[in-house]
């Protein structure tokens, strides 16, 4: 416990909040170019082939981003929009690719949660 005089000399410093998505540098999204598109396996109890992409952002960061949804059209040199948001069972994946924006098309035959996967309202 500091004395009153010690607090007068130098006030208490507030804790600096550490961002969970530093590559975005405070922006909601960033544009980037895919340098590698591949699949990877999740941590233990889960088993799958998760689709991820290595992306070079406009902020000069090289990150790993998750490709959500079933099926995608991304390949090397595809221009994508990246948002924050980690994937709990993939270590080191702290970003998501935004579907239906730039070179990434929306998910085919998606009828529920369409806005999350870049799908327009179906004609009925």
Curated annotation (Swiss-Prot):
Disulfide bonds: none annotated. Keywords: Plastid, Ribonucleoprotein, Ribosomal protein, RNA-binding, rRNA-binding. One of its GO terms (molecular function) is structural constituent of ribosome. Residues 10-20 have a biased composition (Basic residues). The keyword rRNA-binding applies. GO terms for cellular component: plastid; small ribosomal subunit. The keyword Ion transport does not apply. It is found in: Plastid. Its main location: plastid. SUPFAM superfamilies: Nucleic acid-binding proteins. Residues 1-28 are annotated as: Disordered. It comes from the Eukaryota. Pfam families: Ribosom_S12_S23. GO terms for biological process: translation. InterPro entries: NA-bd_OB-fold (IPR012340), Ribosomal_uS12 (IPR006032), Ribosomal_uS12_bac (IPR005679). Belongs to the universal ribosomal protein uS12 family. With S4 and S5 plays an important role in translational accuracy. Located at the interface of the 30S and 50S subunits. Part of the 30S ribosomal subunit. NCBIfam families: rpsL_bact (TIGR00981). This is Small ribosomal subunit protein uS12c. It comes from Prototheca wickerhamii.
